[in-house]
From Swiss-Prot:
Its main location: cytoplasm. Disulfide bonds: none annotated. GO terms for cellular component: cytoplasm. Pathway: One-carbon metabolism; methanogenesis from CO(2); 5,10-methenyl-5,6,7,8-tetrahydromethanopterin from CO(2): step 3/3. Catalyzes the reversible interconversion of 5-formyl-H(4)MPT to methenyl-H(4)MPT(+). Belongs to the MCH family. It catalyses: 5,10-methenyl-5,6,7,8-tetrahydromethanopterin + H2O = N(5)-formyl-5,6,7,8-tetrahydromethanopterin + H(+). This is Methenyltetrahydromethanopterin cyclohydrolase. GO terms for molecular function: methenyltetrahydromethanopterin cyclohydrolase activity. Its EC number is 3.5.4.27.
Amino acid sequence: MISVNLASLPIVEDMINRKEDLNIEVIKLENGATVLDCGVNVMGSFEAGKLFTKICLGGLAHVGISISGSLDNKLVLPCVKIKTSHPAIATLGAQKAGWSVSVGKYFAMGSGPARALAMMPKATYEEIDYKDEADVAILCLESSQLPDENVADHVAEKCGVDVSKVYLLVAPTASMVGAVQISGRVVENGTYKMLEALHFDVRKVKFAAGIAPVAPVIGDDLKMMGATNDMVLYGGRTYYYVKSDEGDDIENLCKSLPSCSAETYGKPFLDVFKEANYDFYKIDKGIFAPAVVTINDLRTGKLMSYGETNVDVIKKSLKFSQL
């Protein structure tokens, strides 16, 4: 079986070798673990964001960035593009932010290959029938703080590997790399909703592709959380090849997937978050989805699409002004 950790290791090694070119910093902790700072004390870069995203996806996706990406020629933004032939494993088995890493005063949302070793969360891996048994653990952390030896020891213990084989990549939400990797979740937003909200067997998704604009760095982590989510919710477009079974209602799946199916659709995400008193659990989970979903049903040959991009909300979210 494919190992998302082993598939990602050469990408990590490439980042280490190109640290100056990528504007990142590599730190060797006293216990032997390796930390890649991709935006805490460094600038980072689009290329670092691309590689960070590819690692989040377990090395099982092609990731590209188009600087000339546009939405209806009304607002020009960089766009990140994702393609994967292993959608369930890459997005839910690796990229999903399914590990809340809390050690002492340190907290970060963890995603990427190491989750498949720690089985975080176990239910997801049972649903997609996947596990990894690599001897190296690679975890991507969304945090404005760098992890220390205690965090690395915790990850090593949960993953069952020697701490010297732990690699921790860190990028704050309010950073170039952070913005790229969150927009790079455009495909995962769809597969996550398929599984968690619509209870569709994501193993039937045989190929997936997506594109989403990348948010400019407009403020602190809270402001960027709003902006980065809006890039996917109102600008993300996805394409799924699904091999359905007889009895699967793929048209209903397609209509139910996009963010426009949520009651809170039409507002910038930060406004929705404020209205929920900053409590994620009070937010309609249906909003966490791409703006447009296109599905090709391989069994019936049907092609269908639902949803639309909403440039006006993106402009409002970014407080954009045309000079």
